[in-house]
């Protein structure tokens, strides 16, 4: 049985305690390292509030030297090599699949909201041939019951009962984490900062210090 490689992509704008909780849950349940991969400029989201370099720095501060959490900057590097090209997950997974070979198990870690919006992703149906999905559900909202329509048909037969299914094949299965999503969201954190509300407790201390020192996410002064 080949070892599993897990990547957790996102804008991390800013990285908050909910992001880290998801990464740690996947690391602990699957007993493999999680590689956190900041996106350049995702085509299906608004332009991030911090620069790519700032988001990378914040993620590096959040991870520190914590065992089992690693940082991968390939999407940011690709944006430098090909300025103006959209950052698509399918391109990243194809690059990873080329590096790892066709047989190595590969998984993409997401929150439930991302999976439910999968049909808006570029070449979304191709993703299942490239990687597994590991999904953090929201408390009190069973993911499988929320999926219907085109996505529901695409996910039929892919749900894994346990983590061994991810190690047994290279791609195509969906595993739900036992640890549910926390309530934090990056958009809520940005809104709290802009409004002058309490926000520090939502971020790792080193990230909170960085945000404050650089004046990130504050409302423009009239």
Curated annotation (Swiss-Prot):
Pfam family, one: CTP_transf_like
The keyword Metal-binding belongs to this UniProt entry's keyword annotation: no
Species annotation: Stenotrophomonas maltophilia (strain K279a)
Statement: the UniProt record of this protein carries the keyword NADP: no
Catalyzed chemical reaction(s): nicotinate beta-D-ribonucleotide + ATP + H(+) = deamido-NAD(+) + diphosphate
Family: Belongs to the NadD family.
Entry keywords, A to Z: ATP-binding, NAD, Nucleotide-binding, Nucleotidyltransferase, Pyridine nucleotide biosynthesis, Transferase
Upper classification of the organism: Bacteria, Pseudomonadati, Pseudomonadota, Gammaproteobacteria, Lysobacterales
Protein known as: Probable nicotinate-nucleotide adenylyltransferase
Name of the gene encoding the protein in the UniProt record: nadD
Metabolic or biological pathway, per its Swiss-Prot or TrEMBL entry: Cofactor biosynthesis; NAD(+) biosynthesis; deamido-NAD(+) from nicotinate D-ribonucleotide: step 1/1
One function term, GO molecular function aspect: nicotinate-nucleotide adenylyltransferase activity
General function of this protein: Catalyzes the reversible adenylation of nicotinate mononucleotide (NaMN) to nicotinic acid adenine dinucleotide (NaAD).
Catalytic activity, EC: 2.7.7.18
